[in-house]
Amino acid sequence: SLAPAAYLLFNRVMRHDPADPSWPGRDRFVLSCGHSSLTLYIQLYLAGYGLELDDLKALRQWGSLTPGHPEYGHTAGVETTTGPLGQGIANAVGMAMAARRERGLFDPDTPAGQSPFDHHIWVFASDGDLQEGISHEASAIAGHQQLGNLTVVWDDNQISIEDDTRVAMSE
């Protein structure tokens, strides 16, 4: 259900360069709901990060560039390994805090929006991510630190591994 939003982010909003996946000024995309890895892999394929159609067909196959959960260092364009629900949210909060700290240390006088450290962190999170305690703790510090360079997009589809989310969650 987040595929159209991912397409919009990668093609109209995010600053990134498939020719230089490690460019320091790039925006970061974290798929906290790593089980929906195909959402990310399709965007990397369409954006030109080096994935081929055969890589997408090999989804979740041993040795493929498209494992069941995104793995940092395995597939170009993947910013962090995600698997345990909620972990991606916490990683993204850390990335946002680090970007702000790096800007303060290395580029404090550059006007807003012109520093390579002004990148934005985008997170896709599922209901299952938000049911995990780590996401609550990470969100609390993000709010306390007023991280304006972090956006979490919540896929509020009321689905969890157990059943409808109303069984265990009313937020």
What spans do the regions from the language model cover?
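Short internal beta-strands
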Residues: 30-32, 149-156
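Long, well-ordered, tryptophan-enriched scaffold segments
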Residues: 153-171
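Cofactor-binding active-site loop characterized by glycine-rich and histidine/acidic residues
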Residues: 1-145
